[in-house]
């Protein structure tokens, strides 16, 4: 009997871009659910999207098949298409400029190599329950950080 799939939904949010940002993760494995979230000052939406994926992968306890759903075309295309080219070009884009968020992409690349992962893009704010929960967590993290400093 094959192992169940670890179903992960990741999302990032930013109030201002750059501005205060948050990330949220919903992880489902069989009947078990885990949520993660965090926030940062002076960040971007893309950084929060990447951070959500990184934190999700860091939280995995043991190898299993993984499906990661993101509403970020940047993350989905980056990890599935652009990353091999960036690495071959010494972490530079087609214009020969260093890629943005290099430290996050390198961290995600290392974690991505540890597991068997299928990356899936989902339309944001379109009623996908897992994506809606991850989005809610990201926004809740932003509000929590705001309240801590008010």
From Swiss-Prot:
Keywords: Cytoplasm, Endonuclease, Hydrolase, Magnesium, Metal-binding, Nuclease. SUPFAM superfamilies: Ribonuclease H-like. It is found in: Cytoplasm. Its EC number is 3.1.26.4. InterPro entries: RNase_H, RNaseH-like_sf, RNaseH_domain, RNaseH_sf, RNaseHI. One of its GO terms (cellular component) is cytoplasm. Mg(2+) 2 binds at residues 11, 135. The keyword Endoplasmic reticulum does not apply. Mg(2+) 1 binds at residues 11, 49, 71. It catalyses: Endonucleolytic cleavage to 5'-phosphomonoester. Residues 2-143 form the RNase H type-1 domain. GO terms for molecular function: magnesium ion binding; nucleic acid binding; RNA-DNA hybrid ribonuclease activity. Its cofactor is Mg(2+). Its main location: cytoplasm. Binds 1 Mg(2+) ion per subunit. May bind a second metal ion at a regulatory site, or after substrate binding. GO terms for biological process: DNA replication, removal of RNA primer. Endonuclease that specifically degrades the RNA of RNA-DNA hybrids. Belongs to the RNase H family. Monomer. This is Ribonuclease H. It comes from Dichelobacter nodosus (strain VCS1703A). The gene is rnhA.
């Amino acid at each position: 009997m094959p192992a169940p799939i670890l179903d992960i939904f990741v999302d990032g949010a930013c109030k201002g871009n750059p501005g205060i940002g948050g990330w949220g993760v919903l992880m489902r494995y069989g009947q078990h659910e885990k949520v993660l979230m965090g926030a940062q000052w002076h960040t971007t939406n893309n950084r929060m999207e990447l951070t959500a994926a990184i934190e999700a992968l860091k939280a995995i306890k043991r190898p299993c098949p993984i499906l990661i759903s993101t509403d970020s075309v940047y993350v989905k295309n980056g990890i599935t298409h652009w990353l091999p080219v960036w690495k071959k070009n010494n972490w530079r884009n087609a214009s020969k400029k260093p890629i943005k968020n290099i430290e996050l992409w390198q961290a995600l690349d290392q974690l991505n190599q540890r597991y068997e992962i299928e990356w899936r893009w989902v339309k944001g704010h379109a009623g996908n329950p897992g994506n809606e929960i991850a989005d809610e967590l990201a926004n809740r993290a932003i509000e929590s950080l705001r309240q801590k400093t008010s």
